Amino acid sequence: MSTRRVVVDAPAGASSSMPLQRHKASFRAAQSPSSLDGLPASRTVAVSGLVRTPRVYVGMAPSGPTGGLGARVTRRALGISSVFLQGLRSSGLATAPAPSLERDLGAVEDLGGCLVEYMAKVHALEKVSQELEAQLRMHLESKATRSENWGALRASWASSCQQVGEAVLENARLMLQTENIQAGADDFKERYENEQPFRKAAEEEINSLYKVIDEANSSKMDLESQIESLKEELGFLSRSYEEDVKMLYKQLAGSELEQLNVPIGTGLDDILETIRIHWERDVEKNRLQAGALLQAKQQAELARRAQTQEEKLAAALRVELHNTSCQIQSLQAETESLRALKRGLENTLHDAKHWHDIELQNLGAVVSRLEAELREMRAEAEQQLQAREHLLSHKCQLQRDVASYHALLDREESS
């Protein structure tokens, strides 16, 4: 059986009526390192001219398989030590040196008697401890015999635990599948939301192209109406020109008939004059007709050239309009594509900034948490170091007390 010695300080200034709870607290202080500060300071008493510490040693406290029973035995021993302490205080030990050798011898004899009585009580406590250990062993053996009927229960418990484990695994698998499906749905939703701006941009581009087509159709209709009006005006001019030419021909023909009805003279001179006048009139008429025809041809040529130039101008205007509309459409399409690209880049930049901020926040939280843990670990390390130093100091103090106790016992045995 392993044993341990428990030391209880006995203050010299305490009265003989000290309650038992004070000594129990001192025993608990010997078990708890945090309460060792409450131990009273050791004082000195003079016995046979020697300076020694007035400590009372409370014998052997059994430890090991008894557990809580050992604690009870120790408390009983502590109660006996308090009685012994009261007898020691009433035995005549003083804080001042004895005036004579007889008083010293009497004090030593009283101390020897108290120690003999104390050793007897220690042997009695050891017997009580052995009896309690035997009872505890019997109790454990009876408990072990009753535990043999637990085989069926263990089998049922094992099957239940296996079923619970399988159910937990199935639940985890289902939760994993659910999370995967949810992640896929979130991915599709995110893709749909990302494609929405591009869809809107394409719809806007299509609407703008429809507007351009409508404008081109309206301009085409305007040009066609202008061409029709120009054709009508050209036809009207050509008809008016033909009517003017016909009227001129009629006027010329009427004047010739009137001039032919003039009476002709009978003389040669008159005949020659008449022929000359007739031929002059014919020449003038031919000249006028040729001039009119030439003028008509020139006007027709000018009209044809003007019509050709107008047609060429209209065709050039059509080609230029078509090219301009194509350029406008291409520029609008390029502008819309650049706008869509700009919006996509802005969204990408915003997402990158957002994720960067989130990552920085997470890293800051991790750093702060690690710093807090580091501070806590440093504080715990400092506390453990202080507790270790405190325990080492009390260990040294207890070793010195045990050494003084052994020296005292050796001197008592040798005496």
UniProtKB/Swiss-Prot annotation:
One annotated Gene Ontology cellular component of this protein: intermediate filament
Modification Phosphothreonine occurs at: 53
Family: Belongs to the intermediate filament family.
Residue numbers carrying N-acetylserine: 2
Protein topology in the membrane: Peripheral membrane protein
Quaternary context: Part of a complex required for lens intermediate filament formation composed of BFSP1, BFSP2 and CRYAA. Found in a complex composed of PPL (via C-terminal linker domain), BFSP1 and BFSP2 in the retinal lens. Within the complex interacts with PPL (via C-terminal linker domain) and with BFSP1. Identified in a complex that contains VIM, EZR, AHNAK, BFSP1, BFSP2, ANK2, PLEC, PRX and spectrin. Interacts with LGSN. Interacts with VIM.
Record function comment: Required for the correct formation of lens intermediate filaments as part of a complex composed of BFSP1, BFSP2 and CRYAA. Plays a role in maintenance of retinal lens optical clarity.
Entry coiled-coil feature ranges: 115-144, 199-248, 295-395
GO biological process entries: cell maturation; intermediate filament organization; lens fiber cell development
Taxonomy, superkingdom: Eukaryota
Entry's localization field: Cell membrane; Cytoplasm; Cytoplasm, Cytoskeleton; Cytoplasm, Cell cortex
Residue intervals of the IF rod domain: 104-415
Keyword field: Acetylation, Cell membrane, Coiled coil, Cytoplasm, Cytoskeleton, Eye lens protein, Intermediate filament, Membrane, Phosphoprotein, Repeat
Stretch list, region Tail: 396-415
List of residues that carry Phosphoserine: 26, 32, 35, 90, 100
GO molecular function terms attached to this record: structural constituent of eye lens
Annotated positions for site Cleavage: 37-38
The protein's name: Phakinin
Pfam families: Filament
